[in-house]
């Protein structure tokens, strides 16, 4: 079973991201706009209960926080991904670190850069053109975050929520 752990932004932020993703992201139909806390990983069905229990513990140790989304960035030249930058807060860093240590030990492919993907799989020329146009626009959004989600991948490649974890003591 393939799992991932994400934060979903507000509908307003998702709508703004989806307006761009429809044109620039081939994964648009597979998963809503999100901030990845832990990249997709394979696990056995019998481990799911332990994973859920650990995520409840992590959520209870994390206070709700404000998500700040603004500006457009890119991972080029490593890959042609365009994204909305998400300010790295202590809470986001804590969540990411907890999901890559102890029970969740897994090699990281990249350093943690919180973001909302709005384009990927673009040619070099298309990437440069889209990035240039989007960098001239002003984007800034903020919202309270009080939960994260464990997703699993269906056979058709789409992702769906398995469980939601509310942040803060007494919420799980």
Swiss-Prot record:
This is Putative phosphoesterase BA_1241/GBAA_1241/BAS1148. Its EC number is 3.1.-.-. It comes from the Bacteria. A motif (HXTX 2) lies at residues 115-118. The active site is at 34 (proton donor), 115 (proton acceptor). Pfam families: 2_5_RNA_ligase2 (PF13563). Coiled coil: none annotated. It comes from Bacillus anthracis. It is an enzyme of class 3 (hydrolase). The keyword Hydrolase applies. GO terms for molecular function: hydrolase activity, acting on ester bonds. HAMAP family: 2H_phosphoesterase_YjcG. Keywords: Hydrolase. Belongs to the 2H phosphoesterase superfamily. YjcG family.
């Amino acid at each position: 079973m393939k799992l991932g752990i994400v934060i979903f932004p507000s509908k307003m932020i998702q709508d703004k991201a989806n307006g761009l993703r429809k044109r620039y992201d081939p994964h648009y139909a597979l998963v809503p706009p999100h901030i990845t806390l832990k990249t997709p990983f394979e696990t056995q069905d019998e481990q799911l209960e332990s994973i859920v229990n650990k995520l409840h513990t992590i959520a209870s140790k994390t206070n709700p926080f404000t998500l700040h989304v603004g500006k457009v960035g890119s991972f080029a030249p490593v890959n042609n991904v365009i994204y909305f930058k998400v300010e790295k807060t202590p809470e986001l860093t804590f969540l990411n670190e907890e999901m890559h240590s102890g029970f969740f030990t897994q090699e990281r492919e990249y350093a943690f850069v919180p973001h909302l993907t709005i384009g990927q799989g673009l040619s070099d020329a298309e990437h440069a053109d889209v990035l240039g146009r989007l960098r001239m626009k002003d984007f800034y959004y903020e919202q309270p975050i009080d939960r994260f989600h464990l997703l699993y991948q269906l056979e058709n490649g789409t992702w769906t929520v398995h469980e939601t974890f509310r942040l803060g003591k007494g919420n799980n």
